[in-house]
């Protein structure tokens, strides 16, 4: 159900009143009447035009500022599966050579029935353990088990090089096996939903855990709230998935995922074990709200149709 909020007010523009028209020397009185009628008509058309322009501007402001919001999946709801179709953009023209993987339809999906609560809780513990070794000075920290990238202060380190064998005190082969099993489940669900070949879909980079809180941003990497298109920001993405590892309104405030559509913003409220996935093109412009309190955990798992952009599952070697 759409929730509509009051528009931000603003004083109407103040217009100067026209002065009293002067009389033309020797002109007949009816001429002055015709001039007055035309003047009123011109000012009327001008006023209507300005009104339409102002209305258009205010409507644009309304949408941009999240004033019209539809909740696609609330945290309190257990969602078996919901799919929301959106027209495909032109961003997939280069994928025609990968026919078995090219989107036959575009959209976004939400499900709470693919990843179990137990699996999600184990994934969160893995994220917490890895991020406990570092963490950003700002509000957003990442942990990439594939490349080893770990936020530390205002920079990133390669945790495999930085910590070496000490990492095995924090992570295990069992953790990596769980990671692979979760990834496979998500890959199969994306393929089933979009009616594409699961074998034509490849894990790609970056794929990473994220931890967000209300700390002030210290670098551009901490500014996670800007609207973006995944296929533009990360060129290899064709399908994006997010697995949420904490609960909106219980573990944190703010931090909802927002699809920015013409006419409304549509949100997904994170819930532990909730899987949200979508085609990565410009039909799915989106952003994440700033976290206002608490800590938000999630993992982004991305897929490509191009085998040249594929990466393997994380391993110790």
Swiss-Prot record:
InterPro entries reported for this sequence: OGFOD3, Oxoglu/Fe-dep_dioxygenase_dom, Pro_4_hyd_alph, Pro_4_hyd_alph_FE2OG_OXY
Sequence segments annotated as region (Disordered): 1-34
A single GO molecular function term of this UniProt record: iron ion binding
Keyword Glycoprotein (UniProt): yes
Ranges facing Lumenal side: 61-317
Localisation per UniProt entry: Membrane
Active site annotation, chain numbering: 296
Record's cofactor remark: Binds 1 Fe(2+) ion per subunit.
PROSITE patterns, per the entry: FE2OG_OXY (PS51471)
SMART domains for the chain: P4Hc (SM00702)
Cofactor(s) this protein requires: Fe(2+); L-ascorbate
Glycosylation (residues): 195, 213, 265
UniProt keywords, alphabetically: Dioxygenase, Glycoprotein, Iron, Membrane, Metal-binding, Oxidoreductase, Signal-anchor, Transmembrane, Transmembrane helix, Vitamin C
UniProt GO cellular component terms: membrane
Binding site for Fe cation: 228, 230, 286
Family statement: Belongs to the OGFOD3 family.
Cytoplasmic face residues: 1-39
Entry binding sites for 2-oxoglutarate: 296
Pfam families: 2OG-FeII_Oxy_3
The protein's name in its UniProt record: 2-oxoglutarate and iron-dependent oxygenase domain-containing protein 3
Its membrane topology: Single-pass type II membrane protein
Main subcellular localisation: membrane
């Amino acid at each position: 159900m759409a929730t509509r909020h009051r528009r931000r007010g603003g004083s109407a523009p103040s217009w100067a009143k026209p002065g009293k028209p002067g009389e033309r020397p020797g002109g007949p009185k009816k001429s002055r009447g015709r001039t007055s009628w035309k003047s009123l008509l011109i000012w009327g058309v001008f006023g209507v035009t300005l009104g339409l322009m102002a209305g258009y501007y205010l409507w644009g402001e309304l949408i941009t500022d999240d004033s019209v919001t539809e909740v696609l999946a609330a945290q309190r709801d257990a969602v078996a599966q919901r799919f929301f179709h959106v027209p495909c953009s032109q961003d997939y023209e280069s994928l025609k050579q990968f026919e078995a993987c090219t989107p036959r339809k575009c959209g976004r999906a939400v499900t709470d029935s693919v990843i179990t609560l137990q699996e999600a809780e184990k994934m969160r513990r893995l994220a917490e353990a890895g991020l406990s070794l570092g963490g950003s000075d700002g509000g957003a920290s990442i942990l990439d088990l594939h490349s080893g990238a770990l936020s530390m202060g205002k920079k990133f380190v390669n945790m495999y090089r930085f910590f070496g064998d000490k990492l095995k005190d924090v992570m295990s082969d069992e953790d990596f096996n769980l990671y692979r099993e979760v990834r496979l489940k998500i890959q199969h669900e994306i393929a089933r939903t979009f009616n594409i070949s699961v074998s034509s879909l490849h894990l790609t980079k970056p794929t990473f855990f994220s931890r967000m809180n209300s700390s002030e941003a210290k670098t551009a990497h901490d500014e996670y709230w800007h609207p973006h298109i995944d296929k533009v920001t990360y060129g290899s993405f064709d399908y994006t998935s997010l697995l949420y590892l904490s609960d909106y309104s219980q573990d944190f405030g703010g931090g909802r995922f927002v699809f920015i559509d013409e006419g409304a913003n549509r949100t997904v409220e994170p819930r532990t074990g909730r899987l949200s996935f979508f085609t990565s093109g410009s039909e799915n412009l989106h952003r994440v709200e700033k976290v206002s309190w608490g800590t938000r955990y999630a993992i982004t798992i991305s897929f490509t149709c191009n085998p040249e952009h594929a990466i393997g599952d994380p391993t110790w070697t």
